[in-house]
């Protein structure tokens, strides 16, 4: 898998930071950056990686994208049709996680079901938040903040970061949760690169 220069810059930023925001315009290949990082992580040894998407359909699509490159056991934590082992019962999630301890594991979930992984109490090595502007919603922020604190590595991918200027509402400008912007690719740069 060959990365374009801006994707390699993003991958290097991820390798140098345990948490942060990766801002790349739509169509810029954010998913490939996450996949390449996941491949590198899994080559190091047994890892648990979580991929969070805003919708079940996107979780399934991301699963197929990751599965093409990453050798790992797959679990889906959401309420939709999965085609893989899955469910939202925290005990079942923890049992699956423990049962597959000799393998790399990737868990695909949605923002709506992320709290079920929190309740399962599993150790997460890396978590990727796709379309991370969704993570600031009040129904999701508790689980997002939990994994921001307890996952070893935590990355927020978006084309459109959502900031807040009021203390009553969480925004991606809260670096204690979302980290700093570790890579920002302007749209004209993508056009330059073709």
Question: Can you name each region flagged by the protein language model?
Answer:
Residues 1-23:
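Conserved pre-motif I regulatory segment
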Residues 17-37:
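Walker A/P-loop
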Residues 31-36, 42, 46-68, 163:
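Conserved Walker A/P-loop ATP-binding site and its immediately adjacent core
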Residues 47-48, 102-106, 124-126, 150-156:
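Loop/turn-to-beta-strand initiation segments
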Residues 57-91:
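Conserved helix-turn-beta segment of the N-terminal RecA-like "Helicase ATP-binding" lobe
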Residues 84-107:
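Conserved motor-coupling elements within RecA-like helicase/translocase cores
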Residues 101-143:
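Conserved RecA-like ASCE ATPase "motif II neighborhood" in helicase/translocase motors
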Residues 133-193:
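Post-DEXD/H (motif II) to motif III coupling segment of the RecA-like Helicase ATP-binding lobe
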